């Protein structure tokens, strides 16, 4: 796994990639992020085309440019169910949100709301796989591994009308 750091307006981030694609985008210290021990086995990549492309796309996103991420992803660290949830998140357009229940119904698992929530919380590719676009049933901000203040900031950046 190759890594780079990115200083974002919402705090330092870690970007990680395998030969197959981007496998991680985390805010430093976020819940469910990689441990320091695990990261010690990774290789810092001063020059890596995929990581550099991810960096540029994220900087454009943070600058408020209309954006759709175009990056190969490696989501193989998740279970089949988690991967299905993460793929469903990719279909939620910028500026829109869904509830955990909406996402469970979309996956034809209407009784699996808690399992969907757990998978959303374990998303390893923050922002690009837009788990921040998932809200509680009443439209309230709930759970975000990077902190609710970041979730609010990301939704505001995307022009979510409810904020």
Residue ranges and their predicted role:
Residues 1-111, 157, 161-163:
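Basic nucleic-acid-binding alpha-helical/helix-turn surface characteristic of O6-alkylguanine DNA
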Residues 131:
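Short cysteine clusters
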Residues 128:
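Major-groove DNA-recognition helix of helix-turn-helix-type DNA-binding domains
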